[in-house]
């Protein structure tokens, strides 16, 4: 039987992502000295209004695409149960959402060049494999993948394939695919009650088990675009190997990581997908029972602070549920209604 936190895991994760995003946007592109001038990092205030970036916008886009592709809002016993999510249906829904985001007047939050370029090319009939940034492994691939870890009723193959597809439509590098799959799996494990201390080993095991699994049903011939392997298996293995190396750095950093140290110095600045996950994990695992502190730590970094804090918030919220976050913060974060709609639907169907 699910405990109280698990019953609101989806809502907690989505709000955590948005709150981390809103905290981290004002500090993005600032060095540690400039951030320190704002005051103690443990007291970093949530801006008012709590405006978010493309991280939250695209997370909502992925969530809405999942709903459209399954014909439901996440409940069990209907068209959204396991087996209903197909690559063709999800690709159509993601394309529609990504193109709408590209043209939206609210798409003015310093979005990444790779996402913009790919979404512009998706506006038409060309195959998505020809629109993607084939050599890009930017964190735009996995900053938005949390919904794949939260939506109930998916098979393991659907969850992994869909996580990689949503990444691959804009970021075609194998590490972007693997890191997105791994990020979604981390969110799922925590939502299901995995203890934080066991998470790194569980992620390492998952990466090892999937190292040579190329999801051809979902990815088609994507592996042939960047020359990163002679076979589909070699292509995807190169991405998982970079994720495993990032987990190595995470596990090496954890024992001696001081709370006032910049996590980016240990696990990377987070501009690329595997570093964004590793550094977010470092923030979360250093403060597993202090979710607000975890996202503040992610926001007060020299790197891609909004994405690091957003992923850390998604992890913390998946574990602790909506009670992790101050009610006053949740009430004023941008896109509150959309976050609540998705989270409630998926929590109800859990």
Label each region the model flagged.
Residues 1-350:
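Structured, active/binding-site neighborhoods that engage oxygen-rich ligands
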């Amino acid at each position: 039987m699910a405990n109280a936190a698990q019953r609101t895991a989806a809502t907690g994760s989505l709000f955590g992502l948005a709150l981390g995003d809103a905290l981290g946007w004002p500090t993005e592109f600032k060095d540690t000295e400039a951030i320190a001038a704002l005051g103690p990092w443990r007291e970093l205030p949530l801006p008012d209004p709590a405006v978010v970036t493309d991280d939250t916008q695209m997370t909502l886009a992925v969530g809405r695409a999942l709903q459209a592709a399954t014909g439901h809002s996440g409940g069990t016993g209907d068209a959204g149960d396991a087996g209903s999510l197909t690559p063709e249906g999800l690709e159509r829904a993601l394309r529609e959402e990504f193109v709408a985001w590209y043209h939206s007047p609210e798409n003015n939050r310093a979005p990444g060049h790779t996402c913009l370029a790919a979404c512009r090319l998706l506006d038409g009939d060309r195959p998505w494999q020809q629109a993607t940034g084939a050599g890009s492994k930017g964190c735009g691939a996995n900053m938005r993948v949390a919904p794949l870890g939260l939506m109930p009723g998916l098979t393991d193959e659907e969850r992994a394939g869909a996580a990689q597809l949503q990444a691959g439509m804009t970021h075609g590098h194998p590490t972007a695919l693997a890191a997105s799959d791994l990020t979604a799996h981390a969110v799922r494990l925590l939502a299901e009650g995995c203890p934080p201390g066991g998470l790194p080993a569980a992620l390492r095991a998952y990466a090892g088990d999937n190292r040579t699994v190329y999801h051809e049903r979902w990815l088609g011939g994507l592996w042939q675009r960047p020359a990163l392997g002679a076979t589909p298996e070699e292509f995807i293995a190169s991405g998982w190997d970079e994720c495993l190396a990032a987990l190595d750095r995470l596990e090496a950093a954890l024992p001696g990581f001081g709370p006032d140290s910049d996590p980016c110095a240990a696990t990377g600045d987070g501009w690329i997908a595997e570093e964004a996950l590793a550094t977010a994990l470092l923030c979360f695992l250093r403060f597993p029972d202090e979710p607000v502190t975890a996202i503040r730590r992610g926001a007060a970094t020299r790197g891609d602070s909004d994405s690091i804090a957003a992923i850390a918030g998604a992890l913390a919220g998946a574990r602790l549920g909506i009670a992790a976050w101050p009610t006053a913060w949740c009430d004023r974060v941008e896109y509150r209604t959309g976050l609540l709609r998705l989270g409630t639907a998926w929590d109800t169907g859990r």
